[in-house]
Regions:
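Catalytic pocket-lining loop regions of alpha/beta-barrel enzymes
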Residues: 120, 136-194
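Mid-domain alpha/beta scaffold segments of enzyme catalytic cores
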Residues: 1-137, 141
Length: 194
């Protein structure tokens, strides 16, 4: 079996990067703030990456299953992930994404997602998430409701860490929340950006 454990799909780009809104235009282009950049190949006419396109690429490459991995860079697409997983249940699984900066409201959204039983876990992109809240750290007490929810439901946490202090915080979280499996994606990526 070949499984892609890090696939992205989105109906449109509606996220945030560099502290600015990012949105789809056409021919693979997106706007970031007031400037337009080529984000995808021009063949991506609507500047989106659909579940159907992913399934076609998977078939072409001989990939049996894929794990849909969200990112605030593209926007919050839990609904699209859920619909795609329901449409292709033998091919796709999906990880949830919530705005953890909302604290208790984010935890309530996660609990609802977990109760539905379609998506699992949670993804956090530290750099994108905290750009809008400088000085916030993974172990910040205002984020505790989110970690408490993941702990209660025994859900894994997929983390893209970009900052050295995230390692210290992750160690503290792992000791505090023993029922959360922390999956580190792209360890050491901050070196590329400094």
């Amino acid at each position: 079996k070949v499984i892609d454990i890090h696939a992205h799909i989105y109906e449109k780009v509606a996220g945030i990067t560099q502290g600015q809104p990012m949105s789809s235009t056409s021919q693979g282009k997106v706007t970031i703030g007031n400037r337009e950049i080529q984000f995808l190949p021009p063949s991506f006419e609507r500047s989106c990456s659909t579940a159907e396109a992913l399934i076609a690429y998977m078939d072409w490459c001989g990939i049996e299953k894929a794990l849909l991995m969200p990112n605030p860079f593209y926007g919050y697409h839990n609904y699209y992930f859920k619909e795609s997983v329901k449409k292709y249940p033998d091919r796709l699984r999906g990880v949830a994404l919530v705005d953890i900066m909302k604290g208790k409201a984010a935890a309530e959204e996660l609990a609802q997602i977990y109760d539905e039983g379609i998506l699992f876990g949670m993804k956090i992109e530290v750099d994108s998430t905290f750009q809008c809240a400088p000085g916030t750290r993974l172990a910040d007490p205002k984020l505790a409701p989110v970690w408490d929810c993941c702990e209660q439901y025994h859900q894994p946490m997929f983390i893209h860490m970009f900052r050295r202090e995230d390692i210290v915080d992750l160690e503290l979280l792992a000791k505090t929340y023993p029922h959360i499996t922390f999956v580190i994606c792209h360890m050491g990526a901050d070196i590329c950006f400094r």
